[in-house]
C-alpha cells in the first residue's frame, strides 16, 4: 500500500503491528485469524481499547490489510478510532498492541483507556 493510500484510510495499521500479527498467526498455524480492535465502555477514562483474534469479518466491519494479515474494526468502534493508528511496541515495560488516537482528549497512564 502506498503512503498516499495509507493516508486515506480511516485507521492505520503499522508495519510493526502487522509483523507481530503475522508472527502470532504463524505460531498459531491459523492464517484465517485477524486482529480485531474494538472500543468498549469502561476503564478509568470512560472508554477502553480491546484486542482479540477473530476468524470472521462481520457485515459492516472495516478491514485493513498489510503484510498479508488483516486488522478488523466494527462500525461502532471505528467512529472513535478515525484518524488513529494501531501499533505494537516491545520494551522494558513489556510488549503490547496499542492505539494512537487523535480523538482522545484524555488517556490513562497505561494508555488502555481514553475519553473523547
UniProtKB/Swiss-Prot annotation:
GO terms for biological process: iron-sulfur cluster assembly. Signal peptide: none annotated. Binds 1 iron-sulfur cluster per subunit. One of its GO terms (molecular function) is 2 iron, 2 sulfur cluster binding. Iron-sulfur cluster binds at residues 44, 108, 110. Its cofactor is iron-sulfur cluster. GO terms for cellular component: cytosol. Gene3D superfamilies: HesB-like domain. It holds the Pfam family Fe-S_biosyn. The keyword Cell membrane does not apply. InterPro entries: FeS_biogenesis (IPR000361), FeS_cluster_insertion (IPR016092), FeS_cluster_insertion_CS (IPR017870), FeS_cluster_insertion_RrpA (IPR023063), HesB-like_dom_sf (IPR035903). It comes from the Bacteria. The keyword Metal-binding applies. Keywords: Iron, Iron-sulfur, Metal-binding. SUPFAM superfamilies: HesB-like domain. Required for insertion of 4Fe-4S clusters for at least IspG. HAMAP family: Fe_S_insert_ErpA. Homodimer. Belongs to the HesB/IscA family. This is Iron-sulfur cluster insertion protein ErpA. It comes from Shewanella sp. (strain ANA-3).
Amino acid at each position: 500500500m502506498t503512503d498516499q493510500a495509507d493516508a486515506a484510510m480511516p485507521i492505520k495499521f503499522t508495519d510493526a503491528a502487522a509483523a507481530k500479527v503475522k508472527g502470532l498467526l504463524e505460531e498459531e498455524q491459523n492464517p484465517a485469524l485477524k486482529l480485531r480492535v474494538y472500543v468498549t465502555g469502561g476503564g478509568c477514562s470512560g472508554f477502553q481499547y480491546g484486542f482479540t483474534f477473530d476468524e470472521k469479518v462481520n457485515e459492516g466491519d472495516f478491514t485493513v490489510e498489510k503484510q498479508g494479515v488483516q486488522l478488523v474494526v466494527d462500525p461502532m468502534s471505528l467512529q472513535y478510532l478515525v484518524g488513529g493508528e494501531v501499533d505494537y511496541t516491545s520494551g522494558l515495560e513489556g510488549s503490547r498492541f496499542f492505539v494512537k488516537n487523535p480523538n482522545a482528549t484524555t488517556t490513562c497512564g497505561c494508555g488502555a483507556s481514553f475519553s473523547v
